[in-house]
Amino acid sequence: MKKPTSAAGAKRPTKAHRKTREELNQEARDRKRVKKHSGHSAGSRANGSSASGSTAQNSKQKDPRIGSKTPIPLGVTDTPVVKQHKPKSEKPMLSPQAELDMLENDERLDALLERLEAGEKLNAEEQKWVDAKLDRIDELMQQLGLSYEDDEDDEEEEKQDDMMRLLKGGN
């Protein structure tokens, strides 16, 4: 049975010319020859650069980031290595009064103290932080000559004086 042909007037495109085995082999040899000569010459790394006069230029163009500037001892030494410490960013020193005011107005400290007064237990980190801040407040108050104990004693004395007046019937 014959296959039906397409439309009578339609022509097929001509087939592309297929290369013979010899032509393919010749092209492969040409590609290989070009590829073979595309690299650096043998021993180019050991021999250095091809231009002998360019060594002075190479030293000028050398990247300054490469290599260490500090000498490194290669043997075992008894002296410890002294490292240069980078200065930490200096915090502005506050006067004791300013630091005390800052600590007394600290919102986090106030919130944690309110939680303690309400009967809540703080975790270890929060408790440690609160203790450190309260200790610092005590130190600053001693430096400034202030103390809570004096205020409490004065209040107790005033209460006793008030009671004595009431008992004696005085105004």
From Swiss-Prot:
<comment type="subunit">
    <text>Interacts with Der.</text>
</comment>
<dbReference type="Pfam" id="PF04220">
    <property type="entry name" value="YihI"/>
</dbReference>
<dbReference type="InterPro" id="IPR007336">
    <property type="entry name" value="YihI"/>
</dbReference>
<comment type="similarity">
    <text>Belongs to the YihI family.</text>
</comment>
<dbReference type="GO" id="GO:0005096">
    <property type="term" value="F:GTPase activator activity"/>
</dbReference>
<feature type="compositionally biased region" description="Low complexity">
    <location>
        <begin position="40"/>
        <end position="59"/>
    </location>
</feature>
<comment type="function">
    <text>A GTPase-activating protein (GAP) that modifies Der/EngA GTPase function. May play a role in ribosome biogenesis.</text>
</comment>
<feature type="compositionally biased region" description="Acidic residues">
    <location>
        <begin position="148"/>
        <end position="160"/>
    </location>
</feature>
<keyword id="KW-0343">GTPase activation</keyword>
<keyword id="KW-0690">Ribosome biogenesis</keyword>
<protein>
    <recommendedName>
        <fullName>Der GTPase-activating protein YihI</fullName>
    </recommendedName>
</protein>
<dbReference type="GO" id="GO:0042254">
    <property type="term" value="P:ribosome biogenesis"/>
</dbReference>
<feature type="region of interest" description="Disordered">
    <location>
        <begin position="145"/>
        <end position="171"/>
    </location>
</feature>
<feature type="region of interest" description="Disordered">
    <location>
        <begin position="1"/>
        <end position="99"/>
    </location>
</feature>
<feature type="compositionally biased region" description="Basic and acidic residues">
    <location>
        <begin position="20"/>
        <end position="30"/>
    </location>
</feature>
